[in-house]
Amino acid sequence: MVPESPTVAHLSQVIHDVTAPAFLLGALAGFISLLMARMNRVIDRSQALNAIGDNDDVKGHLKSDIPRLKRRAALLNWAIFFSTISAIVASFLVIVSFASAYLSLQHEYVVGFLFILSIGFFVTSLLSLALETRIALHEFDHFGGK
């Protein structure tokens, strides 16, 4: 038994309804790109500091920054993880919206819950980025940068 095909008006309404999650997906893609760039910078700095010899009296003090870089990398890793989960949930939200329209199912509560869940993961990711940024700025002050 094939369900009744949705009307053009109904599909148009579904497309309208998934506009916010689609914009959220675009924002998350850009945000994950930003997080990856920050992570690459932290990794590059860690590799440079690890390359400093233990007997280097001139640059040896810079190695004290390695634990801070590890903490930043961990926070960025969590931010990337939560952003990715947010994007997956937002994608699932779009799928549920269209599948529900095709199958003529009520989906308002599920879609609302998925949107709240996706935004919650995004906020968690933003909080991880805020903590990482705070550590990065503290690090800058610690080494006398102005």
Where do the language-model regions lie?
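Cytosol-facing regions at membranes
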Residues: M1-K146
